Amino acid sequence: MNTVSVVQFLAVGCAVFVLYGRGVFAAEGVKKAGQHKDAELCLGSDGLGHRLDEFWYNDDMCQRFLCFKDDEGIMYEQIANCPIAIAEGDCTLKPGTKGHYPDCCPAVECPPEDQKKRKFKRKCFLVNILTTLLTKLVKNLKKNQQ
């Protein structure tokens, strides 16, 4: 399984996890990156060159980006967006703060008796972090095998 397949699998897994957990729908994806004039850089969605394996942000859209190469040398751009938050029952929707993703994302706040929804939100955030870390780990393992 190549890096892109692993990332896509985890992103879909997170989306399914969130979908069935009620209240929040994940929004993350991977697409082929454009070719920058400097072969060492990735051409991001913003039209700028970015170093591989380094995050950059669009604070206006509350997005996080990451470029990486798969084992065939093809560059991909991972885009993380805010999940769609839906407040149900006694829960309320709290706007995100200014700053980088994920702090700028809206959040569902529930009364103390509804702790399950809070735990669920943390789990999905951890899945997003693990997806990013796993992508880097797979790349490093493949480099070490060569």
From Swiss-Prot:
Q: Which stretch is the leader sequence?
A: 1-26
Organ and tissue specificity = Expressed by the venom gland.
The terms under GO molecular function for this entry are: toxin activity
Q: Which GO terms describe its cellular component?
A: extracellular region
Q: Does tRNA-binding count among this protein's keywords?
A: no
By its UniProt entry, which InterPro entries does this protein fall under? Answer: SVWC_dom
Q: Which keywords does UniProt give here?
A: Disulfide bond, Secreted, Signal, Toxin
Give the UniProt subcellular location, in the record's own words: Secreted
PTM summary from the entry reads:
Contains 4 disulfide bonds.
Q: Which domain of life is it from?
A: Eukaryota
Q: Which family does it belong to?
A: Belongs to the scoloptoxin-16 family.
Q: What is this protein called?
A: U-scoloptoxin(16)-Er1a
- Please name the source species: Ethmostigmus rubripes
